[in-house]
């Protein structure tokens, strides 16, 4: 669990799709003292108290920031995703994902020419890597042909990749629904891709 009070943050947000929920919706928590001073960024129905020709009076928070029709189905789906994850248990999910992460790192380290990016400390089950001599997009395309989904590119972090001296990376995101067999298939495919492109 996260305590925004313990963190001392002004805002805290996350995307639903990071929790197996739908795209296009997320959660934003904001400190009341800050939200109260903010004007609405968008206008529409249900967020105003009254509208006149030259000015408007807005609802109090949070309604002030809820213009128009909300993404009702997506919000319900996010709730279902959270219920699903809580039903399994977040500690159990974290345990499974950490075991998969360690297995994946061990397997990937054996792939010739593959370099893991990032630190060796505790981390979420996301791994970025480069395969020497093979552009990340080529790796992703070849893996996709094998039915393996990854992301490739700069991952909204171009300054980081410039500092690392690489032109992007391949990123895998593991989840408790993945298997050891899938990790082994990924590593086998990467060995074959390395041979094919060199």
Give names to the regions the model predicted.
Residues 1-198:
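Pyridoxal 5′-phosphate
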